[in-house]
A protein has these predicted regions:
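Conserved catalytic alpha/beta core of Sir2/sirtuin-type deacylases, generalized to analogous enzyme cores
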Residues: 1-282
Length: 282
């Protein structure tokens, strides 16, 4: 009996020597987190900042100048709500279930840090634009990042009228200056030692899978994306046994040169992942 597209993908993953996952904003949106939207969540949780500064989305909030005690109030609310979830989403659980028994690596521009809590090994996840759950010295006096969850909880508990008490503001352990969240949306974002180590592991993974059955799973990446999508498409083109599978609601882009080794899945990601996990023949 002929397989449907979900069964075909399930079989391709089963036969893979390694899985390379690429993920961007479309995956976040499928989980209910949209940094570009003036949606109900943003209006309810950031309404005071929205009114005071004319903000229209999360990303806008990172670009508008604020006093440090206000900026950390904005950031700590966001981190607690979107990057410190009690339970991984069904989507993330299903993605992990597909690859957990394989050699895998994740490259993502998403900063909400949802991969590791879902079971992915931290050393196999390269967050190209940093993580909301990390902070670093704003003065860049040294090249280290630090977890910020403990500080975030303290700040959200004591925030008053959109400001964090000055005594709770994170300070650099080296120079005593202000800390800031380690995310690419910050104009001062730079590549850290940790970033460079992850980048090296990414290239090592690709080299180790050269000539083997590499499956590229791409989640929520727009066709213009040069950071992740373009390199993944190029990799699919040069690797003879590679398969390229892209999931993106409302927009599927597959170049002609890799069309024969590719599959595009439009529509509801939650449904697609459930069906692929089943791997059943109807």
């Amino acid at each position: 009996m002929k397989m449907n597209v979900y069964q075909e993908i399930s079989q391709i993953i089963k036969e893979a020597d390694g899985i390379l996952i690429g993920a961007s904003n479309g995956l976040s949106i499928a989980e209910g987190y949209n940094i570009f939207a003036d949606d109900a969540w943003f209006q309810e949780n950031m309404g005071d900042f929205r009114e005071k500064y004319g903000l229209r989305c999360i990303l806008h909030g990172f670009s508008v100048p604020m006093k440090v005690e206000e900026k950390w109030a904005f950031v700590s609310r966001l981190v607690k709500a979107k990057a410190m979830q009690d339970e991984p989403s069904e989507i993330m659980k299903n993605i992990y279930a597909l690859v957990k028994d394989k050699e895998y690596f994740v490259v993502t521009s998403n900063a909400e840090d949802h991969f590791v809590p879902a079971g992915f090994e931290a050393d196999r996840v390269f967050e190209m634009e940093g993580k909301l759950t990390q902070m670093r010295c704003k003065n860049r006096c040294h090249d280290e990042v630090y977890p910020n969850q403990k500080a975030v909880l303290a700040m959200t508990e004591e925030e008053v009228n959109g400001r964090v008490p000055k005594e709770l503001l994170p300070k650099c352990p080296k120079c005593g200056g202000d800390m800031e969240v380690n995310w690419g949306a910050m104009s001062s974002f730079t590549e850290t030692k940790n970033w460079k180590e992850k980048a090296a592991r990414y290239q090592e993974f690709i080299q180790n899978l050269h000539g083997k059955k590499l499956v590229i799973l791409e989640f929520g990446i727009g066709w213009r994306n040069q950071m992740i999508k373009a390199p993944l498409m190029q990799l699919a083109a040069v690797e003879p046994q590679a398969r390229y599978i892209t999931f993106n609601k409302g927009e599927i882009y597959i170049p002609e040169e890799i069309k024969e080794k590719s599959i595009g899945v439009d529509g509801n990601l939650t449904v697609a992942l459930k069906e692929i996990r089943k791997g059943r023949i109807d």
